[in-house]
Amino acid sequence: MILLFAVALVLPAFLWAAYVALRVATVGERDEPHPAHAVVVLGTREYSGWPSPPFGARLDHALSLYAEGLAPLVIVAGGDPEGDSYTEAAAGVRYLEHQGLPAEALLTVGGNNTYENLREVKALAEQESLESVLLVSERFHMLRSLVMAEDLEIQVYGSPTNTSPRDHNPALRFYYMLREVAAYTAYVLGLRNPTPV
């Protein structure tokens, strides 16, 4: 009886985790380089005003989408979750300007997690009459980001970077997959402020 009870508890959780992991993987492979009013880069760690390698990969991808003419603006999202003197958004803008992106093509929003970032993007889009966005992050992060954007009624297309070091290290890839399953589940359950990524 105890064994059956344990199976009844564990099996649904396992099936849910497997389902979410499959969706994370599937959506992360989907690239929709669709014309939009702005490219949105979701921030992640920065160090003393310069992006971490994963953040740099996101920014490089956004730069390539801008260079292809898919959007006239790049919005860099990210706050200051650790009390640094730079926000993630400011570090991203600094990097993109260093790569030659003109200042007039750059906008920033704050927020210390994905949902807050996208809520700020929604407000800016309404303010600037931006009807659609092309969202950039890493593969593992795309499902949750796109679902959140759609829940906020943002017209969104997804274009993940494929150059993040987290994608090319099997141990890191597995870790971030597990982390994303937990974060997506927390969001679905109504906990809208999962750990920033």
Could you say what each language-model-derived stretch is?
Residues 21, 170-197:
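A transmembrane-helix-recognition feature enriched in membrane-embedded lipid enzymes
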Residues 1-37, 197:
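N-terminal membrane-anchoring alpha-helices
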Residues 20-177:
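A structural signal for short, hydrophobic/glycine-enriched beta-strand patches
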